[in-house]
Amino acid sequence: MPILKLTPKERAVKSGATMIRDDSAFQKLGATLDNINVGSAKVCLEIKQEHTNGHGFCHGGVIFTLADATFGFACNSYNMKAVAQNCTITYISPVKKKDILISEAKKIKKFGRSAIYDVTVKNQNKDLVAIFRGHSREVGQNLFDE
């Protein structure tokens, strides 16, 4: 009987599920992986009281964590473990409790074991909240056996 190979989309979905299973920080964040494909991902988060800072806005670290998680799903979508080498974020506008954040990552360029991804974070009104750029490095291991 022939061995069935995963399609790239199936590989990305399985990679995302494997990461969620093993990522306690993502589980505690309360976000959802809404879409994943090869080199891209979409994660959503409703902002709750526990996400706010002393000014009553969403804490910048929460927004960074959301963007970083989205970047992580995108760069690990090939079933090759990848880690962040460098990440930067620019905050554009404040986020309030009950806002829904939509974070979307897209591969810009992959070269060898390294890659660059851009992530946009928007609110439910499609207002730009933050721009994140992540540089990843594959570490030479699979997330799961194929």
Label the predicted regions.
Residues M1-E146:
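Terminal targeting signals and extreme-terminal segments of soluble enzymes
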